[in-house]
C-alpha cells in the first residue's frame, strides 16, 4: 500500500494556514478581552471547540472529495481505505500539536501581561505547560471527530438521504471519546445533558480513541468497500 503523502500533505498545509489565521484572531480576541474586559480564563480552551468541527469537516471531505477522485484514477477502494486510515492516524496528532503550540503561546502572553490563566472545565491537563497531556487529550478528540466525519460522509455518499441513520452512531462515537477527556458538556443547542459517564484518565482516553478508530473505520469500510462511483450533478 502506498503512503498517502499527497492526501496527507494537502490537508496538513491547509490546516497549517488555517491555524495561523485562527491564531491571529484568537490572540486579538484575547488582547481585546484583557484590555477592555476581565480575563481570568484560557481563551484557547473555548477556541478549541471550533477546531473539532474543522476536523469533522476534513473527515467528511476525505470521502466526498477524495474517494471519487481515487476511484476515477484507478485506485481501489481498499487503497483509499488504507490511505484514509493512515491520514487520520497522522493528521489527528498534527492538529493536536498545533493546539499545544497555541496553549504555550497563550501561556507566554498571559505571563507577560500578568493575566490569570485558568481552565473552565475538567481536562486531562491543568496547566498549559503539561504538553504531553494536552497533546494526548486533543489527539484523542481529533481522532473521534475525524472518524465520525468519515463514517457519516461515507453513509451519505452511498445512500444519500439514508445517511441520516449514520448520524446517531457518529454522535455516539464523539460523545464516547469526549467523555474520557473530561468534556461531558451537552451538544451545541441542546439543553439536556447527553453523554457517557466515564473516568477521565489517559488510559481511558487512549482506549477510547483506539476503539473509535477501529470500530468507526471498520464500519466505514463495510459501507465503501463496494460503493459505486457517483457522478457529480452540475
Place the predicted regions along the sequence by residue.
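Membrane topogenic helices and adjacent juxtamembrane segments
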Residues: 1-36
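Helix-loop-helix units of permease transmembrane domains in multi-pass membrane transporters
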Residues: 4, 63-89
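Selective transmembrane-helix segments that form parts of the transport pathway or gating/packing helices
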Residues: 11-22, 82-104
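Aromatic-anchored segments of alpha-helical transmembrane domains
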Residues: 23-28, 92-96, 170-183
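Secretory targeting signals
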Residues: 28-49, 90-159
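Long, hydrophobic alpha-helical segments
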Residues: 44-64
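Hydrophobic/aromatic residues in alpha-helical transmembrane segments
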Residues: 59, 63-66, 148-151, 216-220
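Terminal transmembrane helical anchor/hairpin motif
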Residues: 101-137, 158-234
